[in-house]
Amino acid sequence: MQKLHIILFLSACFFSINIWSQQVTVSGTVVDAKTGETLIGANVYNLEVRQGTVANNYGFYSLKLPLGDNKIKFSYAGYQVLEGNYFLTKDTVINIRLLPDTELDEVVITASNPQQNVTSTEMGTIRLSPNTVAKVPTLLGETDIIKTLQLMPGVQSGTEGSSGFYVRGGGPDQNLILLDGVPVYNVNHLFGFMSVFNSDAIRNVTLIKGGFPARYGGRLSSVLDIRMKEGNNQEFKGEASIGIISSKLTLEGPIVKDRTSFMVSGRRSYFDVIAYPFQKKLNNDNKNNGIETESWVNYFLQDFNVKVNHIINDRQKIYLSFYTGKDKFSLEDDNSFDYMTNENDFGLEWGNFTSALRWNYIMSNEMFCNVTATLSDYKFKFFYDYKFSDTYSKTSSESYIQYYSQVRDYALKVDFDYIPAFQHSVKFGASATRHSFSPGVTVIREESQYDKPVDETYGNVNLPAYEYVVYAEDDFSVNERLKINAGLHFSAFGVNNNIYASLEPRVSGRYLVAPNLSVKASYVKMQQYLHLLANSSFGLPTDLWVPTTARVKPQRAWQTAVGATYSLNNDYEFTIEGYYKKINDLIDYGEGASFFDLRKGNWEDLVVTGMGECYGLEFLVQKPSGKLTGWVGYTLSWSDRYFDEVNYGGKFPYRYDARHDVSITASYQITKNIDLGAVWIYRTGYPFTLSDEQYLSLTDMFISGGQQHGSAMPEVIEHFEQRNNYRMPDYHRLDVGANFHRTKKKSQRTWGIGMYNAYGRNNPFFVFPSREVDDNMKESVRLKQVSVFNFIPYVRWGIKF
């Protein structure tokens, strides 16, 4: 009997090996037939065995299939489906070029293919195309990726009009924002009213809110992965646009057809150009009228994207990409009176620079390799320079103060995709990053004839840190219904002879209840070694990036989520997700502190440490195709904070906690040349802190020698029982827009018009208490709000050629 068991076991092993040997590998790339652009996430599906995969971020796919006849379908949203019968006898390379479906000009895809969302293990993932972004009406008509993402459930916008975003109760520093794989530390133009991402230069946008794969790390709340266009390798193309704030120009084309291509895109505002002649005339008029005053106010924003890629051979490809962006504001005020001259100069500027050199190598039909070297540099600086001179007394003085901060990263990473069998898709890799921080450096210089000169520098001029990562994950099918993505992310961080390490498990899974219905669950652990000290005083870009130190621990979080996805005839997709997130070792300024206090102390002395708790439900209904497209999102959420030194250690709501958040986004194609867009938003008001008691105190009066001294003017002293103890009024608005297209010869021209806040709702930008006295001399305190963005129309013009 024992011999029989051995024979049966060996026979089963031989049979399994024989079956395994009957499989072959089909691999290749999927690209746009007209431009050569890789189609990220293209679907490759075997209709015979009902197994499939998706192309990676570089268009590469690999799929294990049985020997013999196979019917394979290649598809991508907005492109013609390609089906083919293939008789496979060995490993085969099939490179696919999909044609855009010209009959689908009206179709806008707001996320990935609905059926793919049902079958994948991904949770909390949103994908956007540039076409989607272009049809969403926005503030002043500036198409903006970030503002479109703010319309998704689980994503808060923060202050009205801003380009920051807050995911599932997390802070802005907890979003890993990648441009071609390079971290971007500041996404704001125009003091936050625009983002730095020029949508004309963008090919693909993916936001992950939960269930993070092991290949991502270093942040707690989300991953925003943005990929720039690679450039058309078939023919020269371009587009340009003129708006109220800025103008853009994008050019792309082949350097060597089918092998080498480029893409360049630039954007610049023109406030300084328009304002210059008016300011010059005003200064000349003052001079002619004997007023010795000269004033100049200037502001501009600009950014520039460049990408070049070259196909070395069928297995190798190289990319080089750059981004640089800058905001600069300056104020000069010079005046003279008799013998005296005063000169006041104020300046504020910030910007990002990123670059990436990437090499793709298809090592075999089962193995893909990507090696990347990157640089990311973010700088912020402001200065104030005051000069005084008196020619009569022959005296002069000068005071200069400068504050700046900087983060610079050099990184090298290698990533592998490995497909050992049709049930498995393995990703693994490693990276090393050198961070360089200048967290809040203040320079002060003072000179005069009567005082000793001052020349001092405060803060850390350069603080290096090193971060290392190793990860591995496997997306595998247990059976036809159950699929799991499991992985580990290991990281280590060293700064000032202190080393922190973290082993972070990641697991997510889906179970197919029916072919068009799945339930999903995930658990992830994350650790973040960088902190952002958000300035608590005003809205300038004075946020300070600081590293983990011996005194300040890394931020840690874990998140679990459950949900379900249902696709109705591939026309509608319904998603519901519930999540719970716990965050530890958050930092914030202590009560009353801000970056100005850095002059007299280290930033570590100004912060307090606490924790956060976030949970909620998200609902999303999408209609991704047809004449009417769009989505409806609803979020029910709670986000609380706990700091021992704040609020007596008690719980208080996060400043961007909103109980209810609703967004309805729709686009309707009336004809091929006319489309309409509308957005309606409703949100519970954000919390803010208001004193619950006020006292009058004669703080500068005292009695000495039997006499009263001081002004005896009362001063109001406020008592704050709790932080964020009041809420602003609820927020809602309607934005509408229309695009009119006209095709002439080889160009398409578009006029866009629209209205932001179409029904003129006075939403609060901020709220403040106001003391009022009535006719009976009775004093009361009332809340008043300041509204900035009422009814704002826009117009823009664009051309594609």
Which residues does each predicted region cover?
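Short, acidic, small-residue-rich periplasmic hinge/interaction motif at the N-terminus
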Residues: 31-35, 42-47, 75-79, 89-137, ...
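A beta-strand signature from Gram-negative outer-membrane beta-barrel systems
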Residues: 96, 151-152, 196-235, 248, ...
